[in-house]
Regions:
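Peripheral, non-AAA+ core regions of ATP-driven protein-machinery
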Residues: 1-218, 222-225, 331, 471-472, ...
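Short beta-strand elements
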Residues: 18-24, 283, 387-390
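Basic, amphipathic alpha-helical bundle interface domains used for macromolecular binding and assembly
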Residues: 33-44, 59, 66-76, 290, ...
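P-loop NTPase nucleotide-binding/switch module
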Residues: 170-209, 213, 240-295
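Walker A/P-loop
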Residues: 219-260, 325
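The Walker A (P-loop) glycine that initiates the GxxxxGKT/S ATP-binding motif of P-loop NTPases
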Residues: 221, 285, 307
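Walker B catalytic acidic pair
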Residues: 300, 306-307, 318
Length: 519
């Protein structure tokens, strides 16, 4: 008897409907076609055990299985459930008239318990697009899948629950998630606040500008100056995620299996802080079965690289293209996977190997050669891609003890949102551009053209600091953001002046100045 059930194969963020065909006739052979990987083929043993524990027998017959389309590689254990239901139906052990109305995904434990799978949300989106009545998933995946409207989602504990649902022996209610209510309730809840930061007003201003324009930023200062503390509070002043951004971000985390149990939608911008020992593959994504890396998990959020020079130099260099393109393409011999990675890159580093250059409370013990080797770990092209570069000095104890609580994140966030609203209106006719940091060169000339006084100031800065052409464009982008924060339609000389101040770590000035002083 030939039976068909339906499942899905996830390739990056793309999902393909898979028809699971099972034909059982007298005989003793077991065959599987359709490019299933090891996890798919091993499903036979899991299915046999799950059926036996729940009172069914794995058929002793000639079983032929095909996973169509046969030329598409199928990976993972999510095919256990559709295979088990197809085998039960083809053998006559169960009868269901609605089997073809549902898409099924789930890994089976040996006792028949359904284990969570990766990619439940994009699978649910595909199921709705294919006009399936419903989707059956493991209980742990039900809330992320139930985000999709106009699709019945059933979260099941074990295979017996699935059998009872599909045979009509019991009636189950589909899972319902009030997506909008949960999304907006959690959107503005932050555990960290800029009010906790005493002093460092100039750095907080730089972070405000970065948040307002979506700019990358690096902070350089001695240990204990507050670099990590401020970076971790950046999400609290960023504009809230839109529902479409939240859905896109949640899909990436779903495919990576990073969603917390019970989570329906990610309602706050991600903050990822990988350790400096991270590999290239873990950072940008890849592997035998390509998975999203940290840069994609930070999509629509923040990627924080603490102690930047401690990262492997080659690992840092692979960031250059994603920072420009806002996507990462992973190529294999027979297919290509693309993950989005539009994130704010925030980095911190010490000013020298010992960490105490320019610290009034500690003496720097580094030689010029040590400083040069330390600085060479960060290439000029990578530094050029960081719009805002600022130095931090420690806050003296007397200032920490006397200072009033800093400005709360909510107040800063209001200004950031107003600036972003200006940018949204400005770029409404430009596809893929939402903030100043994403402006193309032509758009810079259109929206951030400096006046004569600003051009003279820029010329002086370019010559004095040996700035690159890319740095010139970065200055204009940042100046446009500062003007938006001021509510100014034009980029004026004071905006250019502040933006130039955020390029004080460029190679032509900062590294050489340190070597001269160290001597």
């Amino acid at each position: 008897m030939l039976v068909k059930t339906y499942s899905a194969a996830v390739n990056g963020l793309d999902v393909t409907t898979v028809t699971v065909e099972v034909n059982i006739v007298p005989g003793v052979m077991y065959r599987m076609t359709g490019l299933g990987d090891t996890a798919v083929r091993e499903g036979r043993d899991r299915i046999a055990s799950a059926l036996q524990v729940n009172g069914y027998k794995f058929p002793h017959a000639d079983i032929t299985i095909n996973l169509a389309p046969a030329d598409l590689r199928k990976e993972g254990s999510s095919f256990d459930l559709p295979l088990a239901m197809a085998i039960l139906t083809a053998s006559g052990a169960v009868t269901s008239d609605v089997l073809a109305d549902y898409m099924l995904v789930g890994e089976l434990s040996l006792d028949g318990t359904l284990q969570p799978v990766k990619g439940a949300l994009p699978i649910a989106i595909r199921a709705r697009a294919e006009k399936f009545k419903g989707l059956i998933v493991p209980k742990q995946n039900e809330r992320e899948a139930a985000v999709v409207n106009n699709l019945e989602v059933y979260g099941m504990e074990n295979i017996m629950d699935v059998i009872k649902l599909l045979t009509g022996r019991e009636v189950y209610e589909p899972t319902f998630v009030d997506t909008r209510r949960e999304f907006y309730e959690q959107q503005s809840r932050f555990d960290l606040d800029f009010a906790d930061v005493r002093g460092q007003e100039s750095v907080k201003r730089a972070l405000e500008v970065a948040a307002a324009g979506g700019h990358n930023l690096i902070m350089v200062g001695p240990p204990g100056s507050g670099k990590s503390m401020m970076a971790k509070r950046l999400p609290s002043i960023l504009p809230p995620l839109s529902l479409s951004e939240s859905l896109e971000t949640t899909q990436i985390h779903s495919v990576a299996g990073k969603l917390k149990r019970g989570t329906s939608l990610i309602s706050q911008r991600p903050f990822r802080s990988p350790h400096h020992t991270i590999s290239e593959v873990a950072l940008v994504g890849g592997g035998i079965n390509p998975q999203p890396g940290e840069i994609s998990l930070a999509h629509n959020g923040v990627l924080f690289a603490d102690e930047l020079p401690e990262f492997n130099k080659q690992t840092l260099e692979v960031l250059r293209q994603p920072l420009e393109d806002h996507k990462i393409t992973i190529s294999r011999s027979k297919y290509t996977v693309e993950f989005p990675c539009s994130f704010m890159f925030i980095a911190s580093m010490n000013p020298c190997p010992c960490g105490y250059y320019n610290d009034p409370t500690h003496k720097c013990c580094c030689t010029p050669g040590q400083i040069q080797r330390y600085m060479s770990k960060i290439s000029g092209p990578l530094l050029d891609r960081i719009d805002i570069q600022c130095e931090i000095t420690p806050v003296p104890f007397k200032d920490i003890s006397k200072a009033q609580p800093g400005e709360p994140s909510a107040a800063i966030r209001e200004r950031v949102i107003k600036a972003r609203d200006i940018q949204t209106a400005r770029y409404k006719d430009f596809k893929g551009v939402h903030c100043n940091a994403q402006m193309t060169e032509r758009m810079i000339h259109q929206f951030a053209e400096p006046d004569e006084a600003s051009i003279a100031l820029l010329r002086t800065a370019m010559e004095k600091f040996s700035l690159s052409a890319r740095a010139y464009n970065r200055i204009l982008k940042v100046a446009r953001t500062i003007a938006d924060l001021d509510g100014s339609q034009r980029v004026e000389v004071q905006h250019i002046s502040e933006a130039i101040g955020y390029r004080n770590l460029d190679r032509g000035d900062w590294a050489e100045r340190r070597l001269v002083i160290a001597k």
